[in-house]
């Protein structure tokens, strides 16, 4: 199999056809970073240098997660959801449930929150809003969603797979407006996209660009492209922006699928820089740098100001890395074998690791209080501290 064909099939495996079933590529196990195929055999882990001591602060169970889970974080609480309809609001300090609900639905996106209302999306294309463990309303969407709803300003904003943005009333789920930004692309990515607020502007990602929208009526304000659709077929032309993204003030950095990473001034709608990088997971970052893992498992750091490459770590090739998260002095990245790795921000060197279970780590969130909360595909939720 040629390298070009491997890249094309890897892109295809992460997409869905609009209005159709999930596209799967069988018989070619070398597509995935954690494949058992010899061509892409996961690199053996280096010896743990033990430069940080890692301990578990608390652990709890969520349920299997088979969709692109995005945590909803507000103050000291975190909203999480599982495929089986479990929705929970956790206290990030103790790990205890503030409340837990069980919906009679399979979930495909979640969990957005403003600290009071948690919003998720079901396989039946319903947005479900929950407060204190009780469903307060449901609202039907016209398309499947893989991106967690944004709950802000008394509204719930939803980005669906067909690149439509819908605004719902936070009190009753009534539809306020809908904006469709699809530009004829027949393929979409079965991963979480980009939606957030900067000041009085709603910002979403579609077709390689950030779009600023008036949240009151859905009218466009600006666009800032960090990638352009190129290629000889529909697969190669998919360049949607992917979660997670990195925000510092008005500057937001994101990855365009298998194309570039880049940063924009989200208040002005101005592109600051872009850099080529073939990857299928989002980014982390801090005031100094942006951190990401490419498709082959290299971890990179880019200067946040101008995009200059600061360092790369090739010690995790084909291990199925997720998007790095930034602590005060370290970055943290998870892999497909359930390991969470701590790296130096200065040069990317490995500092230590811990295994939370034997399933892929979906994400790890740096709380800002000296701990990292990691969630695995099998539903393990663990807070870890590195000293």
Residue ranges and their predicted role:
Residues 2-16:
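Bacterial N-terminal signal peptides that target proteins for export
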Residues 23-47:
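Bacterial Sec signal peptide processing site at the extreme N-terminus
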Residues 36-42, 50-72, 99-115, 136-152, ...:
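Extracytoplasmic beta-rich repeat domains
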Residues 82-83, 122-123, 160-161, 205-207, ...:
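Structural signature of WD-repeat beta-propellers
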Residues 91-94, 131-134, 169-172, 215-217, ...:
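Short loop/turn segments that connect beta-strands within beta-propeller blades
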Residues 293-300, 308-342:
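Loop/turn-rich, solvent-exposed surfaces of beta-rich toroidal or solenoidal domains
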